[in-house]
From Swiss-Prot:
Single GO term (MF): UTP diphosphatase activity
Species per Swiss-Prot/TrEMBL record: Leptospira biflexa serovar Patoc (strain Patoc 1 / ATCC 23582 / Paris)
CDD domains reported in the protein's UniProt record: Maf
Keywords, alphabetical: Cytoplasm, Hydrolase, Nucleotide metabolism
The protein's name in its UniProt record: dTTP/UTP pyrophosphatase
Major location (coarse): cytoplasm
Catalytic-site annotation from UniProt: 65
UniProt catalytic activity: dTTP + H2O = dTMP + diphosphate + H(+); UTP + H2O = UMP + diphosphate + H(+)
One GO term describing the cellular component: cytoplasm
A Gene Ontology BP annotation from the UniProt entry: nucleotide metabolic process
């Protein structure tokens, strides 16, 4: 069985669209950043924490996390409307990076991987930022935005679209030998 250790609706949808039969079993963890912890150190620690310690040999476990980084600082999920405005104002008209990391736990061990996507934002005024927040309610999204949002702030990107949605799909697919059995099992049951 394939166990997704995440409550993210976007990760769930990406994997469902690929044909996975998922068991959703998120870990509830402290997502506080440690003092002097770099963004990539934080990302890896979060992914491994979300993976948890449970392991059943017939299962493949997947955990993931996404961070938005500007000037080597993580812009976390906003806590309220004012925080979302603050974050979007910082990013307006500028470039930043989105990192999504994931870990697969399988019978032979655990493998961690991540991807980076470069994002260029539109230069929005205060009114445009407030309208976007009202329209999109980006409170569950790192960086206060979704690349998939209509009339959103993303002007351009270099890298993976699904990475910005919260899942490093290219890296995941390149490790197909780790999860192909779970996927084939699902396909066989459909026939």
């Amino acid at each position: 069985m394939f166990v997704l250790k995440s409550a993210s609706p976007r990760r769930k949808q990406i994997l469902f669209d690929l044909g996975f039969d998922l068991k959703i079993d998120p870990e509830h963890i402290d997502e506080s950043q440690k003092e002097l912890e770099s963004p990539l150190e934080y990302l890896e620690r979060m992914v491994h924490s979300k993976l948890g310690t449970l392991f059943e040999p017939n299962n493949v476990y997947l955990a993931a996390d996404t961070i938005v980084v500007y000037q080597n600082q993580i812009l976390h999920k906003p806590i309220d409307t004012n925080d979302a405005f603050r974050i979007l104002k910082i990013l307006s008209g500028k470039n930043h990076s989105v990192f999504s990391g994931a870990a697969l736990r399988h019978p032979n061990g655990t493998e961690y991987f991540y991807e980076e996507t470069m994002i260029g934002f539109q230069n929005w005024n205060d009114f445009e930022i407030n309208e976007y927040i009202k329209r999109s309610k980006p409170f569950d999204k790192a960086g206060s935005y979704g690349i998939q949002d209509k009339e959103g702030p993303v002007l351009q990107w270099i890298g993976s679209y699904t990475n910005v949605m919260g899942f490093p799909l290219r890296s995941f697919l390149s490790r197909h030998e780790l999860w192909i059995g779970s996927w084939e099992e699902r396909i066989m049951r459909r026939d």
